[in-house]
A protein has these predicted regions:
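C-terminal extensions of enzymes
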Residues: 159-203
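Metal-dependent enolase-superfamily TIM-barrel catalytic cores that perform enediolate-based chemistry
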Residues: 1-68
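Short loop or secondary-structure boundary microenvironments that flank
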Residues: 1, 27, 99-102, 176
Length: 203
């Protein structure tokens, strides 16, 4: 715990007070541990704490949020707008993070964003930024895109026209829909062939 505090102190000292710091515990803590750790990190003004406990633990997130005052970010591990509605209604989340590849594509992503808007909550789509950027631009409550190293279609090399992030910003393609053009040859290199092994027959 002390090591986390020293890391936060060092980073905050390095970047200064105006740069938002987002923390992700990757569901590693119990609610009690999350409260202790978040309380110790709060002096460094974290912008959000993402999934401090098991993602499905709605009431635990409510408890951690109320006990610490640190904004809770979650959503990458939720799959339906009904789950999102449950968490929003309970007051378990401050920043909503739907993943377009998990919630069912553009239509569901936009429904979740509209639902979040009704709770006055911002949306920061998780992962696959090339697919999410058009949707984000259509969200009145869109915050920004969350990107991960190696997690973009451009980095995977499957786009005929890569979309670049410049100084932390990207522009959506001018074409409708997701607007991206895949490179068929590059996609072929990622093709999975063969069949999955059959489960053993019950004895």
């Amino acid at each position: 715990m002390e090591e986390d505090v020293e890391r936060m102190r060092s980073v905050r000292r390095l970047v200064g007070p105006g740069v938002p710091l987002m923390l992700d515990a990757v569901q590693k803590w119990s609610a009690g541990e999350a409260i202790r750790r978040a309380s110790m990190l709060r002096p460094f003004d974290p912008y959000w704490l993402e999934e401090p406990i098991r993602a499905e633990d709605r009431d635990g997130h409510v408890h951690v949020r109320r006990a610490t005052g640190v904004p809770m970010a979650l959503g990458e591990s939720l799959f339906t707008r009904y789950e999102f509605a449950d968490f929003m209604r309970a007051g378990a989340v401050d920043i909503v993070q739907p993943d377009i590849s998990r919630v069912g594509g553009f239509t569901e992503l936009m429904k979740i964003a509209k639902l979040a808007e009704s709770y006055n909550l911002p949306v920061a789509p998780h992962f696959l930024i090339e697919l999410s950027v058009h949707a984000l631009c259509g969200m009145p409550n869109g915050l920004f895109l969350e990107d991960l190293p190696g997690g973009s279609l451009t980095e995977l090399g499957v786009l005929a026209e890569p979309i670049r992030v410049v100084n932390g910003e990207m522009a959506p393609p001018a074409r409708p829909g997701h607007g991206i053009i895949f490179d068929p040859a590059a996609l072929a290199r990622h093709e999975i062939t063969g069949r999955a092994p059959a489960s053993p027959a019950p004895a």
